[in-house]
Amino acid sequence: MNIIRVPVLSTNYIWCLYNYKNECIIIDPGEATKVLDILKKFQFRLRAILLTHNHIDHVNGVAPLIQYFPKTIVYGPTETKNNGSHFLVSEGDDFVLLQKKFKVLNLPGHTPGHIGFYSAPWLFCGDTVFSAGCGKICIGFAQYMYESFLKIRYLPRNTLIFSGHEYTLSNVNFAISILPQDQSIINYRNKIIKLYKKKQPTVPTTLNLELKVNPFFRCGNSNIKKSLNLPCDLKEEWQVFSELRKKKDSF
């Protein structure tokens, strides 16, 4: 199975998975027009849509796509029940599409019911993990988002992370502001700048890389605590995570 990246809106990515039979799966269609263009160009037959959460920039294309392909099956969390989901799924559920098994992970934080879809080595995590960053957190859900990061942290290191947006340069600039002497982040920023100048994407990323350059995966780091003016002996890493995200919100 192969994957096509479909950039839409200003920063969104829709993901199109397809097989040798020209059957395809669409993940988080924030709009329909460009997806329909891809389907027409490659003569793909849409079999399923996967939704990670209910924000409009991830679901707005569902209804138009269903109009064109009425037999399409839609999988999503409970919060997407009014946006076309036929099967409401959560952690513990798995299913097979195009002969590939997908495992559902609960990843609350960006929204209360946010989920991800894992099909080794791919993770489609919506707006949970971004390269060098994390999604905005709904009020009161910082600890849940931290726990979602922990869940992702323990996936295989070769996991490819497919995020819902292209935010990497902003994220890596923030990471440098927190850890200005970190050589891994400095090197990564230099790489990202080159990619941006060439108008090339930075997603997907890998879990192995994110564990090195993403401060939200490194909340036990004493230099991060120092940068946030937090006690070095603070044990609750989710509190570090929360302060880090607050700092990013005002960056």
UniProtKB/Swiss-Prot annotation:
Q: Name one GO molecular function term.
A: hydroxyacylglutathione hydrolase activity
Q: EC number(s) on record?
A: 3.1.2.6
**What's the top EC group for this one?**
hydrolase
The protein's matches in InterPro entries, at most eight in alphabetical order, are given as: Clx_II_MBL, Glyoxalase_II_hydrolase, HAGH_C, Hydroxyacylglutathione_Hdrlase, Metallo-B-lactamas, RibonucZ/Hydroxyglut_hydro
Matching SUPFAM superfamilies: Metallo-hydrolase/oxidoreductase
Q: Which cofactor does it need?
A: Zn(2+)
Q: Which SMART domains match?
A: Lactamase_B
The record, for Gene3D superfamilies, names: Ribonuclease Z/Hydroxyacylglutathione hydrolase-like
* Record: residues binding Zn(2+) 1: 53, 55, 110, 127
A Pfam family per the record: Lactamase_B
Co-factor binding comment: Binds 2 Zn(2+) ions per subunit.
Query: Which residues bind Zn(2+) 2 per the record?
Result: 57-58, 127, 165
Q: Does the keyword Hydrolase apply?
A: yes
Q: Does the keyword Hydrolase apply?
A: yes
Q: Which reaction does it catalyse?
A: an S-(2-hydroxyacyl)glutathione + H2O = a 2-hydroxy carboxylate + glutathione + H(+)
Role, per record: Thiolesterase that catalyzes the hydrolysis of S-D-lactoyl-glutathione to form glutathione and D-lactic acid.
Q: Family assignment?
A: Belongs to the metallo-beta-lactamase superfamily. Glyoxalase II family.
Oligomeric form and interacting partners: Monomer.
Q: Could you tell me what this protein is called?
A: Hydroxyacylglutathione hydrolase
What organism is recorded for this protein?
Blochmanniella pennsylvanica (strain BPEN)
